[in-house]
From Swiss-Prot:
This is Small ribosomal subunit protein uS13. GO terms for cellular component: cytosol; small ribosomal subunit. One of its GO terms (molecular function) is rRNA binding. Part of the 30S ribosomal subunit. Forms a loose heterodimer with protein S19. Forms two bridges to the 50S subunit in the 70S ribosome. Residues 93-127 are annotated as: Disordered. The keyword Amino-acid biosynthesis does not apply. GO terms for biological process: translation. Keywords: Ribonucleoprotein, Ribosomal protein, RNA-binding, rRNA-binding, tRNA-binding. The lineage of its organism: Bacteria, Pseudomonadati, Acidobacteriota, Terriglobia, Terriglobales. InterPro entries: Rbsml_uS13_C, Ribosomal_uS13, Ribosomal_uS13-like_H2TH, Ribosomal_uS13_bac-type, Ribosomal_uS13_CS.
Length: 127
């Protein structure tokens, strides 16, 4: 099993699909990395030799950040938005949708489970 950027790539998948298991690498970026590393996309991870894996590692390191560094960057950007008091930071702080979605009826994923009303609690205890 090839280990790239701290992620074990599945051996039975094609390399262009397996690279998308790394946080920060999507389909188009995986194809660009393989082109830069001069590796064919229609090969399985188990068929790669050590030299090809090293070329892929080098291509990923030369590109932008992935995995832990990228997660850290994203969290730092969110913290910065909260600190400067922007509208987006306020929405992050209140755990509400940030990009303008409606919240009157939807947004249950972001807002969490429904908070019961006092009337509902009285009915539940009366039964």
């Amino acid at each position: 099993m090839a280990r790239i950027a701290g992620v074990d790539l599945p051996r039975n998948k094609y390399i262009n699909i397996a690279l998308t298991y790394i946080f920060g690498i999507g389909n188009s970026r995986a194809k660009a990395i393989l082109a830069e590393a001069n590796v064919e996309a229609n090969r399985k991870v188990s068929d790669l030799n050590e030299e090809e894996v090293n070329r892929i590692r080098t291509a990923i390191e030369n590109g932008s950040s992935v995995e832990g560094d990228l997660r850290k960057d994203v969290s730092m950007h969110i913290k910065r938005l909260i600190e400067i008091g922007s509208y987006r930071g306020y929405r992050h702080r209140r755990s509400l949708p940030v990009r303008g979605q409606r919240t009157h009826t939807n947004a249950r994923t972001r807002k969490g489970p429904r908070k019961g009303t006092v009337a509902n609690k009285k009915k539940a205890t009366a039964k």
